[in-house]
Design a protein with these regions (language model features):
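A short alpha-helical cap/connector motif
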Residues: 1-110, 114-122, 132-177
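Short beta-strand/loop segment that forms part of the nucleotide-sugar
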Residues: 126-129
Length: 177
């Protein structure tokens, strides 16, 4: 009885000290700690809050992803979303937003609407918000099943797929902040 009580009382301290050591891949650990678990955005918070409005948390996560991956070219859906464009330019001014029909394969694809869920454009990184809604949910499932290498990170609303050839195929279900 005493051992059970001791385990119950020391559980919060053990949980606090665990600190994410269950993630063994260096890429996954760095991505989770520097992008997904981080709350601040290093200096541009006021400007991002002015751009994002009510959707600050989602756009802050997107900002951190763009800042982390530093994509040269980005495809966004919907293509005329001024807020997405401003967030990308704030995070990485050197990124070029391209149309989906261009021959170049984008480094990153961001989907926040039902546009763009018809086909895979070959991007190394996919960021899909509201992935729990159709047709984005079925697109996410199709992408995950067809991908042989890479990692995906998701919670109940957002899905981030990193398709890099050097990564093993793994899925992480975590709370995105």
């Amino acid at each position: 009885m005493m051992a059970l009580l001791r385990r119950i009382l020391t559980w919060p301290k053990r949980r606090w000290r665990a600190g994410g050591f269950g993630i063994h891949s260096p890429f996954a650990f760095a991505f989770v700690t520097q992008v997904l678990a981080k709350r601040n955005i290093d200096g541009n918070e006021a400007e991002l809050r002015a751009i994002a409005g009510r959707n600050y948390r989602q756009y802050a996560l997107l900002y951190r992803c763009v800042k982390y991956f530093k994509p040269q070219s980005v495809v966004i859906y919907p293509t005329d979303d001024a807020t997405l464009t401003r967030v990308i330019n704030l995070a990485e001014p050197e990124s070029r937003i391209i149309a989906d029909g261009e021959t170049a394969i984008p480094d990153m694809t961001i989907i926040t609407s039902d546009e763009g869920t018809e086909r895979d454009n070959g991007a190394a990184v996919y960021f899909i918000s509201r992935a729990d809604k159709e047709p984005r949910g079925s697109f996410k499932a199709r992408m995950a099943s067809e991908c042989e290498r890479g990692m995906d990170f998701s919670d109940y609303r957002t899905w981030i797929m990193c398709r890099f050839k050097h990564l093993p195929r793994q899925s992480f279900k975590i709370v995105l902040k």
